[in-house]
Design a protein with these regions (language model features):
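Short beta-strand elements bearing conserved aromatic residues within extracellular beta-rich modules
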Residues: 75-77, 113
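The feature marks proteins involved in alpha-glucan
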Residues: 16-60, 94-176, 181-188, 198
Length: 344
């Protein structure tokens, strides 16, 4: 899927006031315009508001957390910084969409965290952040506070050329690769995976030798089970930590671009797994998936199906596609299981 789009600019006045005047919010906080656009399914930068965002604005230092859990009774953020105690950092519910927010001072980059959600039944479930940009290395499954706003890029020439590139006319030859099985270091005690940086250099040499123009990367978004090859995603906004950090992932993309190699990601918007820390029954109810089990599950795969009828779910997925293209400079997406999506 190649994405060419025009940004839509929204200017909304409430009783004569501009949104900036009406909101009176910090840049990292959820405002009325954010609620409106997310509810309409058109907040294409919602990942800048939901999730965990490091704050250092001269007045506050810490992390601002925000999560969509519309049917939760209560939500708290728990982590290393509060001994995983749900009583210490309760979150405030913001209407009308059921977004929970809180600011926790002095939380450092790299801290592990989850959301403790009290369901309508009174149960407590612990969920990873759907908008987390980094995840704990498996078998751990917590989210990890990180700042990806200052990634270093040196591919400006490639990005400028991309604006006018006509992929219908220029030649294209795509090399598909899965980092975890492409090549491994023999004799190591761990799994022997190449890191993002190691793979970038080794794959570039092979791709240039064979004359490919693009690489298509399989299984990049975070996932719990190695055997799924990345097609059962739990962290849609996080490059998997198996091969390194977000900075390492950005380095890989940048390295390919400097060598005039385009990058396509396999993207999985059709379904997601039932792992307890993931999106399934996120707030104790079908949140991201269809409530009707006849529509909400893939019987062959044992996975959940996104409810494309919900504006917030549409927004989650569209913003995710744009996130990879805008924030990580990815050049295109190969959409997985399209036929299964069309069945819905």
């Amino acid at each position: 899927m190649w994405l060419k789009y025009n940004r839509r600019i929204y200017q909304i006045n409430w009783e004569g006031e501009s949104m900036a005047e009406k909101n009176k919010t910090k840049a990292y906080e959820i405002g009325e315009l954010d609620h409106y656009l997310f509810g309409q399914g058109t907040h294409y930068e919602i990942y800048k508001k939901l999730g965990a965002h490091i704050v250092n604005d001269g007045e506050k230092q810490g992390v601002y957390f925000a999560v969509w859990a519309p049917h939760a009774e209560k939500v708290s953020v728990v982590g290393e910084f509060n001994d995983w105690d749900a009583a210490k950092n309760p979150m405030k519910r913001e209407e009308p969409l059921g977004i929970y927010t809180c600011f926790v001072p002095d939380v450092q980059e790299g801290a592990l965290y989850k959301y403790c959600i009290q369901t309508y039944k009174g149960d407590h479930i612990y969920k990873a952040d759907p908008f987390a940009n980094y995840a704990e290395l498996r078998p751990g499954n917590a989210s990890k506070v990180t700042d990806i706003s200052a990634l270093r890029w040196t591919d400006s020439k490639w990005m400028e050329r991309r604006l006018t590139w006509d992929h219908h006319k220029e030649p294209m030859s795509i090399y598909e690769a899965h980092i975890g099985s492409w090549k491994r270091h023999p004799g190591r005690e761990d799994d022997g995976f190449y890191t993002y940086r190691e793979f970038a250099k080794a794959a570039t040499e092979y791709i240039k030798e064979m004359g490919y123009t693009h690489i298509e990367l399989m299984g990049i978004a975070e996932y719990p089970f190695d055997g799924s090859w990345g097609y059962q995603v739990t962290g849609y906004y996080a490059p998997t930590s198996r091969y390194g950090t977000p900075e390492d992932f950005a380095y890989m993309i940048d390295y390919f671009h400097k060598n005039k190699i385009g990058v396509i990601l396999d993207w999985v918007p059709a379904h997601f797994p039932k792992d307890a820390h993931g999106l399934a029954d996120f707030d104790g109810t079908p949140t991201f998936e269809y409530a009707d089990p006849r529509k909400g599950e893939h019987p062959d795969w044992g996975t959940k199906v996104f409810d494309y009828g919900k504006s917030e779910v549409q927004n989650f997925l569209i913003a995710n596609a744009l996130f990879w293209i805008e924030h990580y400079h990815v050049d295109g997406l190969r959409v997985d299981a399209v036929a299964r999506s069309e069945e819905r």
